[in-house]
Amino acid sequence: MVSSDPMTGKNVQHDEHLSANHHVTVEEVVAMATGADQTKYSLWTLSMLRLYGCLVIGYLCATVNGFDGAVMGGINAMVSYQKYFHMASASSSTGIIFAIYSIGTACAAPFVGPVNDRWGRRAGMFVGGLFILVGTAVASRAINHGMFMGGRFILGFGVCFVNVSGPVYVGEMAHPVWRGPLSGLYNCFWYIGSIVAAWVVYGAKTLENGWRIPLYCQFIASGVVVLFAWFLPESPRWLVSHGHLQSARKVLARYHGEGDLEHPLVNLQMTEMQYQVSTEGSDKRWWDYRELWKTRAHRNRLVCVLSMAVFGQWSGNSSTSYYLPVMLENAGITSQSRKLLLNGIYAPLCFVASVSGSMFLDKAGRRPLLMSSLVGCIICFTIITPLSKVADQDPSNSAAANASIAFIYLFGITFSFAWTPISPMYVVECLDTHTRAKGKSMAQFFTACASAIIQYSSGPAFQHIKYYFYIVFIGWDLFELAFIYMFWPETKDRTLEELEEVFQASRPVKRSLEPRSSQTVLNTVHVDAKPVTDGIV
């Protein structure tokens, strides 16, 4: 089959049946795995510096989303915004304005996978960025409630594209030796947007129509993504899935192999990809989502993906992000200036926690960090509930108010340490190349639905039952803790292709906790051999 190479524009001949025509022996596989494992790697080589530049564009996709989370929570507390639209900070109208963003995201989900599969990850980021620019223009210049909601809907529509394309691109481009921290840093950039938004809101709090200024700032990150998306190398896994083997090898050599086309790590990745990625997979059929659930292994993957999509929104974090000023009000803080100041301090603390957590992903593992974080969140909510009640009933009790605020912050830090870096990357890791874009877009749909529900319900809940709303999160987080322990496998220490062995197992969690070995690589490339005992790490 002949097609145009997206990297060079030239026609290239490629094979429709990679795994059928690419045979390797047991000895060759073990030699490749051992060579890749014994090679010394550095974080500061020219190849890695180039890679960081590419990943930053992907990271900015998270910044776009983080900016909105903080900007809406911030301007919702601004008097100028409330007066302009005649709204209260916690009401059903406020919930609708927050939720319409997630509704836009949900509506975009069916289109995101096909765009990524047909035209690549770069195209997904570019298209999403364009929608965000349009939505920002509409919302920032809104003269009535309907126009503002329309802009929010378009913003949410575009964010779905970047929220899928960005983490998928980062996960597929990240160097396998440091995939944990490099992929984990993606969602940490959520807080970059959040920090900028919170402080722009604080600076504009006294200006007439000051609520528009933070919205204008949404042009920045999305504009950078649009400008630079087409200068990025395409994902090597997408290239292999479309038969562009030569281009994929060049990308891997340039960004993972110090320019060496025969680098051990390049050879290992190319071999694993050629056996795991098909040029006839369901990603070539835009309408075909069946591969997400047609086998037991795919169903195992889908359970992890969709549960992460919901858990990542319902652990208490969404309410904290969008309704932090309202939570502070429940804790006895009524001054607009102080609420916005505390809102501005919250994001930097969470950012530091999330970056710190990303450094431990490959050391501690995904499961232990997530479960430990949930235990901390449960403890925080258990303490916040009575403290907020005391502070609300006795405004003069500054000790209760300050303690309540401290534990609200501690919740954010605890959640951010694990869930912020892990949430998007775990979804990417749990999907294979054929289903990654569609699966991530389905996860984004469930995330949007879960987010819309919690955003819409949190406003009335805080208005009517106030601090008792936290009890709901205590019970739900306990359920999440048990679910993760039973059903979520560990994904560290394996390449994306090697995770197939985990999900194919009858007990994926048990298999995932077994150490990686040469046998893992043999199973990945479907080479039959007696069990190999020489472990590689």
What are the roles of these predicted feature ranges?
Residues V2-A253, S278-V537:
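Transmembrane-helix signature of 12-pass secondary carriers
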Residues Y255-L268:
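Short intracellular "coupling" helices and adjacent cytoplasmic loop segments at the cytosolic face
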Residues V266-S282:
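Cytosol/matrix-facing amphipathic helices and coiled-coil assembly/linker segments
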